[in-house]
Regions:
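Paired small-residue
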Residues: 79, 90-98, 289-297
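Juxtamembrane intracellular "pre-TM" segments in multi-pass secondary transporters
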Residues: 175-206
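Conserved MFS/SLC helix-loop-helix module at the cytosolic interface between two early adjacent transmembrane helices
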Residues: 51-87
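Helix-loop-helix hairpin linking two adjacent transmembrane segments in secondary transporters
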Residues: 89-91, 119-177
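C-terminal transmembrane helical hairpin of 12-TM major facilitator-type secondary transporters
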Residues: 264-308
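Helix-breaking motifs and short loop linkers at transmembrane-helix boundaries and internal kinks
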Residues: 30-32, 64, 85-91, 284-285
């Protein structure tokens, strides 16, 4: 029951992160600002998540999982409630900042707890279950939320999201009663020393290469696949839905193999697979069937590294695991911003169909870094028992 509640929580977080994008025109009209000004709500969230994630993770990691996770969900619920009643853009921005504070803590602490409570040899599957909530949020939650905003309005939709988040916080708090923090005894200096290690830095380097590559293409997907969609939004929606379904498959495969010896190479398979997908994209993006194949391949490989990266950081960082995962989340948001910027600069110099080749180069850099990491991070074999 606990892993399922954690997955429901990450589903709501995943929905909350992206659903606001579909509401920007309505929010702008309601608050008497332009759509571009309303878009600052996305910027505030991203910056808040990236900055507050590691900062808040340090004090919250000393608390019990019950306190940390409940506080995170309450912050998300309150932030959405503030947005739902906001009469001005600054008030709505304050609400999104509160949502960012809570969201930045829920996912890393949920991941850490899922791994800690899992039976021996099943921590990877538990992590993948939690991560599946994020994938489902983008595949199902975001389209549903956008539809609800069109039918009922953006304020009732955010209010409903706030109520749903608060409703999950209640059984989660009850289910985690008596679950103590795993690392309350260590001194802060000892607990966070692992974050300075070269292996942790290499893991984060792989993440940022991969994320910059993905968001360089994802941000401009409508332009890259214009030949396949002929400018029709419905066709683009199908391509993005296919990407999301591929993500579900990739996350499932990660969960199935993460606890096996072959799980060491999941991230390598992921970034290498993305390299292939991006290299093939210029040839496939001109037709709708070809674009569909490219998006499914990208979705499968692109979502295959998320849970294994968290799994590896929790192992390498030890007591500072939640902080390391939070730092990884911050790197993702920084990489997303850099990817969008890099993609825009590239499109100013070259045709859109060649943008995936830039992403392929970045993914190839992730492959090189991952190969170096695998050579340095070799699992230790248990010492043989004395005769």
């Amino acid at each position: 029951m606990r892993p399922l509640l954690l997955a429901v929580g990450t589903f709501l977080i995943g929905t909350d992160v992206f659903v606001i994008a579909g509401m920007l025109p309505q929010i702008g009209d309601s608050l008497n600002v332009s759509v571009s000004a309303a878009g600052q709500l996305m910027t505030v969230f991203s910056v808040g998540y990236a900055v507050l994630g590691p900062l808040l993770a340090v004090p919250l990691s000393r608390r019990s999982p019950r306190v940390a996770l409940t506080a995170a969900l309450v912050a998300v619920a309150l932030g959405n409630a503030v947005c739902a009643v906001a009469g001005s853009l600054p008030t709505a921005m304050a609400g999104r900042l509160l949502v960012a504070a809570g969201a930045s803590q829920f996912t890393p602490h949920a991941s850490s707890l899922a791994a800690a409570l899992a039976p021996k040899g099943r921590s990877g599957k538990s992590l993948a279950l939690v991560t599946s909530g994020l994938v489902m949020g983008s595949v199902v939650g975001v389209p549903s939320g956008t539809w609800a905003a069109d039918v009922f309005g953006w304020r009732p939709t955010l209010a409903a999201l706030a109520a749903a988040t608060a409703a999950v916080a209640v059984p989660l708090a009850a289910g985690l009663r008596g679950v103590a923090s795993q690392h309350t005894a260590q001194r802060p200096r000892e607990r966070f020393a692992a974050l300075r290690g070269p292996l942790v830095r290499m893991v984060l380097t792989v993440t940022i290469f991969a994320v910059i590559a993905e968001y360089a293409v994802l941000t401009y997907a409508a332009t890259v696949f214009a030949g396949a969609t002929a400018g029709e939004g419905s066709r683009l929606a199908v391509l993005l839905f296919a990407f999301g379904l591929g993500g579900l498959v990739g996350n499932f495969l990660a969960g199935a193999y993460m606890d096996r010896p072959a799980g060491r190479r999941l991230v390598l398979v992921s970034v290498a697979g993305m390299t292939v997908a991006f290299l093939a994209m210029p040839q496939l993006s001109g037709s709708f069937p070809g674009a569909l194949v490219a998006m499914v391949l990208w979705g499968v490989t692109g979502w295959m590294y998320a849970a294994p990266q968290q799994h590896r950081l929790l192992r390498l960082a030890g007591p500072a695991g939640p902080v390391a995962v939070s730092l990884n989340s911050s790197v993702i948001y920084v990489g997303a911003a850099l990817g969008g910027g890099a993609g825009g600069l590239f499109l100013g110099q070259a045709a859109p169909r060649w943008l995936p080749l830039m992403a392929a180069v970045l993914c190839a850099s992730a492959v090189v870094t991952e190969l170096r990491l695998l050579r340095k991070d070799r699992p230790t074999e248990p010492a043989p028992a004395p005769a």
